[in-house]
A protein has these predicted regions:
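Basic, nucleic-acid-interacting segments
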Residues: 1-297, 314, 335-339, 349
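Amphipathic alpha-helical segments in well-ordered regions
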Residues: 228, 333, 346, 350-354, ...
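Strongly charged, low-complexity linkers/loops
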Residues: 362-373, 377, 386-455
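Core structural elements
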Residues: 189-201, 270, 307-331, 340-358, ...
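Residue-level detector of well-ordered alpha-helical segments, enriched
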Residues: 316, 329, 339-347, 371, ...
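Short, amphipathic C-terminal "tail helix"
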Residues: 443-476
């Protein structure tokens, strides 16, 4: 048995779903800086209003349950989670407790050189609460967020490092985006996590479990775990475990610390029961099968294909799969005949750089795979050098014209052997002294002759062919 303390983490990951309507109303599911513009009577719990289940959100939930290898429920049913808080207009939240859409899942993800097995307790669909805005002398309620559809993934306590946690969260985020289930934008608060943390030694828990609620952003999640791990370690090593309590804490972004909210003794009894306004209904197997067929190739599947079948290295493959649209662009390039390594290099080096500069999506990028092929074909045929190709790439973006407009005789690479050989013979004839010195051991003069050729051709001479001919002619 190890004498070291082991970090144990479980995650409850909430993600806002992509849908025109809210989870249980026809209210618009949108983001606005103006308060209370996306609300409906159902969202604000007006008397006499009844919920209606958003079928699209149920479909999203089923897809994610399948991705997580969960056992998918035969019957869809919803419960009421009862508690009072100003941001909860109904006095309860519609969620799933007794029969989640998916249970007992398992996911394997690579972390460094190992494979991490993540056990999924359940995945369930629920609605979000309203948001409170606190001011000096008052607090206001914004109902825009009330009723926004959320999907919550609950893991078992199976993580032993922040690296494992972030790897899992990033993978799930990418799956949401690949399947068009959510934009999963942490900057907009579309992903929030409750993080459960405690320590083990010799296979036994030695500190009480602490839940850090509602942490937004992967950096904050990592910081919260690291702080809580150190806080509990310090208490254990100084024989102060008795001072630790099972409690709920919140993360303070300003200090990168966690702050106590309530202890187990103050925990809320939510008194879950089946929502009488939403009768349970059967999930048709044919519909579930149709949904599963819509799931595209996921990030790690594509990465494996890119590395094993297309010969890409880990770095390039990892960059390509980060964005589904970039991966789609790459695959279109390969389909139309661009060499996979050439396409990957242009995308990861040139195109991604341009996208980062502008902040645009590759869907809005001017150069299509077909245009990129014009450039790569010109390099392959010797019409353009790599340097000239980059210039054509830049001119294409700047002028919004086809690359072929700039691949002309005026800027084409000189690759005709007879033309180059005649020119090189003339240059050597005019530099006999340098030729003699080169033949007597001053090998660095070879670059001098290359420079003379490039100067005379204004950089258009094929560099490979130039060096080949120079080696032959300098010996004569």
């Amino acid at each position: 048995m190890s004498n070291e303390l082991q970090l144990i983490v479980g995650i409850e990951m909430h993600c806002e779903l992509k849908s025109n309507a809210k989870a249980f109303s026809k209210g618009i599911n949108g983001f606005s800086d103006t308060a209370n513009v996306y609300v409906s009577p159902v969202d604000m719990a007006f008397p006499g209003t009844l919920p209606i289940v958003n079928k699209k959100c149920v479909g999203h939930a089923i897809k994610m349950a399948h991705i997580l290898n969960c056992q998918i429920a035969d019957v869809m049913q919803f419960d009421r989670k009862n508690y009072y808080y100003p941001d909860l207009p109904k006095g309860y939240q519609i969620t799933q407790c007794t029969n989640p859409v998916g249970v007992n899942g398992k996911l394997e993800i690579p972390v460094d050189d190992k494979t991490l097995e993540v056990l999924i307790h359940d995945i369930h669909l629920e609605e979000d609460s309203a948001s409170l805005d606190h001011f000096a002398k008052m607090t206001t309620i914004d109902y825009n967020r009330a009723g926004v559809p959320l999907l919550e993934i609950v893991t078992e306590p199976c993580f032993s490092s922040t690296k494992e946690v972030i790897a899992f969260l990033e993978y799930i985020r990418d799956c949401y985006r690949y399947c068009d289930i959510s934009d999963a934008d942490t900057k907009k608060g579309q992903i929030r996590c409750d993080v459960n943390i405690n320590l083990k030694k010799d296979g036994k828990y030695v500190t009480p479990r602490v839940e850090v609620k509602n942490v937004n952003g992967f950096q904050n999640i990592e910081a919260a775990i690291k702080y809580e791990e150190e806080r509990q370690k310090e208490a254990y090593l100084n024989n102060k475990v008795d001072e630790l309590v099972q409690e709920t804490r919140r993360f303070d972004e300003d200090t990168n610390t966690t702050i106590s909210m309530r202890t187990k003794e103050d925990a809320i009894d939510y008194k879950y029961f089946l929502d009488p306004n939403i009768p349970p209904y059967k999930l048709e197997k044919t519909w579930i099968e149709e949904l599963i067929k819509e799931i595209p190739a996921l990030p790690f599947e594509r990465k494996k294909h890119y590395m094993n079948d297309l010969g890409l290295n880990d770095y390039d493959a990892s960059i390509l799969i980060k964005d589904k649209n970039i991966a789609d662009y790459f695959e279109k390039c390969v389909i139309i005949g661009i060499d996979s390594k050439v396409a990957a290099n242009w995308i990861t080096v040139n195109i991604v750089t341009e996208l980062n500069k502008t902040g645009n999506s590759i869907n809005d990028f001017y150069i299509t795979p077909e245009m990129l092929k014009q450039i790569t074909d010109a390099i392959k045929s010797g019409t353009l050098s790599s340097k000239q190709a980059k210039e054509v790439f830049a001119k294409t973006l700047e002028n919004k014209k086809e690359p072929k407009e700039f691949i002309s005789k005026d800027n084409a690479q000189i690759s005709d052997e007879e033309t180059l050989r005649t020119m090189i013979k003339e240059i050597i004839a005019n530099n006999k002294e340098q030729q003699e010195a080169y033949l007597n051991g001053r090998s660095n003069l070879f670059d001098y002759f290359v420079g003379q050729v490039m100067k005379q051709t204004r950089g258009k001479a094929n560099p490979v062919l130039t060096k080949q001919i120079l080696k032959e002619e300098l010996k004569k």
